[in-house]
């Protein structure tokens, strides 16, 4: 499964803290950085701009982060250590504000953090209730204990409710008799007359308990056979070639992107190494995002270089890893390819599309699920129709625009999945001769650039299906989500 980017960096940071005898700062740093990931617009833990420090220490933490006992006292110190860690190890994103300016901002906020954390008038509803729960001896992260505590609190007497909710009631008097529902740190307040009639599907999405689904039984190939196919993934081989090219260190722009000339050089290097065309487009959309998420490459001291986890990839491709480890690595890369991270520095025009992109993100997963359920090749139009029928997307004015958006998004992700060995595509190869000259020329250019024509063009007879490796990967993910996904004996 995919590793959390913030968690990966925290693991490196904890080693750094231990070496400096500052391990006590690990817990408050974890709360702060996890809070920033969950409650701010920036999900890249190495990217810090002016105002980010103030927002984290004096807005997000006081309003939303429950203090287990170390946050108010050591939060500012922990964040200072983290910023110095980024600077000393060269991990600070090139577009970040310079460290001296960030530390000055932190110094101005440090003395204000503890009073802000103690000011109950600033606490949000979830923090107010979780703090009371913590005081009653229920640990953060104890989901069963939280459910029991909230159930008891919902039935407690009015005086106790008022004591806990006093600061909130001045702003939200309707909470006096509210019924609270909780799941994984998210809290919602319902009217008492709603709780028995409200269907689970009417709860906020974050509070809905996923109901296990039962899928068809599948027959899986032997693990050793699947591992052989996984190690042949073109995406993994391209990632290894990219890391080798980046090993000396390649300059990046302020946005953390490769220079245009280097992008071309890298694509040429990968093409030669993999004996398969690899254009700048393929490199930028299918290889770099996965290689970066998997730490095969990383930005250090303003340069793209080989990453700390490159050794894992080398072992996978060289036969030095066990079949189980090869498949685990392949699956993590598969998840990264299907849900690529957005670059932290967004062009303002592209940033306007982010709400639409967020709506489109789950669609590739629905498409793969449709293929898993079908257990056979699906014609392109049928696949899109099934995906469209399941979509909750509300960003389009009509089905025609919605279909175009979905088709474009799904084509890009399925193309990445094919290069990784998860899906296969077939089409009527005799039909291109009947296409107009311009379309045929476009198809030829796409092939020369390492892109299958069907990613960009409407080709007759196009069908998509999961490979045995893709079936295994989908089954692993469905099972991990708590679904019933049996295997044929």
Question: Predicted regions span which residues?
Answer:
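Accessory beta->alpha helical hairpin/"wing" motif in late/C-terminal subdomains of nucleic-acid enzymes
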Residues: 93-109, 285-289, 294, 298-351, ...
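Short, charged/polar micro-motifs that form catalytic or ligand-binding hotspots
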Residues: 65-73, 225-232, 273-281, 343, ...
């Amino acid at each position: 499964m995919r590793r959390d980017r913030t968690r990966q960096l925290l693991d490196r940071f904890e080693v750094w803290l231990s070496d400096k005898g500052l391990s006590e700062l690990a817990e408050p740093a974890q709360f702060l950085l996890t809070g920033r990931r969950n409650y701010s617009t920036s999900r890249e833990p190495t990217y810090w701009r002016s105002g980010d420090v103030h927002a984290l220490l004096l807005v997000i933490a006081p309003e939303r982060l429950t203090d287990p006992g170390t946050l108010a006292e050591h939060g500012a110190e922990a964040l200072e250590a983290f910023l110095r860690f980024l600077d000393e190890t060269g991990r600070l994103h090139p577009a970040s504000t310079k460290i001296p300016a960030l530390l000055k901002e932190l110094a101005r906020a440090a003395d204000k953090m503890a009073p802000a954390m103690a000011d109950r008038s600033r606490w949000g509803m979830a923090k107010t209730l979780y703090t009371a729960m913590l005081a009653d001896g229920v640990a953060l992260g104890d989901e069963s204990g939280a459910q029991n505590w909230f159930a008891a609190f919902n039935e407690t007497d009015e005086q106790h409710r008022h004591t806990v909710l006093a600061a909130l009631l001045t702003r939200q008097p309707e909470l006096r008799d509210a019924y609270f529902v909780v799941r994984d740190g998210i809290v919602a307040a319902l009217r008492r007359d709603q709780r028995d009639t409200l269907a689970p599907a009417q709860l906020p999405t974050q509070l809905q308990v996923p109901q296990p689904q039962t899928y068809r039984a599948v027959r899986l190939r032997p693990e050793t056979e699947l591992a052989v196919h996984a190690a042949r993934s073109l995406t993994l081989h391209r990632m290894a070639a990219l890391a080798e090219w980046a090993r000396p260190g390649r300059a990046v722009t302020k946005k953390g992107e490769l220079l245009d000339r280097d992008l071309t050089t890298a694509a040429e290097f990968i093409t030669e190494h993999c004996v398969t065309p690899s254009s700048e487009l393929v490199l930028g959309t299918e290889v770099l995002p996965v290689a970066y998420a998997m730490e095969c490459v990383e930005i250090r001291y303003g340069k793209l270089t080989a990453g700390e986890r490159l050794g894992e990839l080398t072992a996978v491709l060289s036969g030095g890893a066990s079949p189980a480890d090869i498949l685990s690595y392949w699956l993590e890369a598969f998840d990264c390819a299907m849900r690529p991270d957005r670059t932290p520095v967004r062009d303002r025009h592209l940033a306007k599309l982010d709400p639409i992109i967020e709506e489109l993100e789950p669609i590739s997963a629905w498409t793969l699920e449709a293929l898993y359920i079908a257990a056979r090749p699906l014609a392109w139009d049928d696949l899109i129709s099934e995906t469209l029928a399941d979509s909750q997307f509300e960003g389009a004015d009509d089905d025609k625009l919605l279909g175009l958006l979905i088709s474009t998004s799904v084509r890009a992700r399925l193309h990445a999945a094919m290069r990784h060995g998860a899906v296969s595509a077939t089409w009527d190869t005799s039909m291109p001769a009947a296409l107009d000259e311009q379309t045929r020329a476009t198809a030829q250019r796409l092939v020369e650039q390492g892109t299958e024509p069907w990613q960009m063009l409407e080709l007759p007879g196009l069908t998509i299906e999961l490979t045995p490796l893709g079936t295994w990967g989908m089954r692993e993910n469905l099972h991990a989500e708590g679904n019933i996904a049996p295997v044929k004996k």
